Curated annotation (Swiss-Prot):
GO-annotated cellular components: ribonucleoprotein complex; ribosome
GO molecular function terms listed in the Swiss-Prot or TrEMBL record: structural constituent of ribosome
Keyword Ribonucleoprotein carried by entry: yes
Xref: NCBIfam families: S21p
InterPro entries tied to this protein: Ribosomal_bS21, Ribosomal_bS21_CS, Ribosomal_bS21_sf
Keyword Ribosomal protein found: yes
Family: Belongs to the bacterial ribosomal protein bS21 family.
Keywords for the protein's UniProt record, in alphabetical order: Ribonucleoprotein, Ribosomal protein
Organism: Polynucleobacter asymbioticus (strain DSM 18221 / CIP 109841 / QLW-P1DMWA-1)
Listed name of the protein: Small ribosomal subunit protein bS21
Gene Ontology BP terms: translation
Length: 70
């Protein structure tokens, strides 16, 4: 559980921003959105496989030399 304590003379908006930042770093929001609805195991495997392929092609694209511009 994520907790943020208000510091002395700290505005609420700043504390809320710190809370949002810690939630984002922990990945709680993405995990919550992923678990919001049930996903079949086959659909989950398919989604993860597609994401892995996308990462692979992205890595290959970044390692390729740029085309010469004539």
């Amino acid at each position: 559980m994520t907790t943020v304590r208000l510091r002395e003379n700290e505005p609420f908006e700043v504390a809320l921003r710190r809370f949002k930042r810690t939630i984002e770093k922990n990945g709680l929001l993405t995990d919550l959105r992923a678990r919001e609805f049930y996903e079949k195991p086959t659909a989950e495997r398919k989604r993860k496989k597609a994401a892995a392929a996308k990462r692979h092609y992205k890595r290959i694209r970044s390692q390729m030399l740029p085309k010469k511009l004539y």
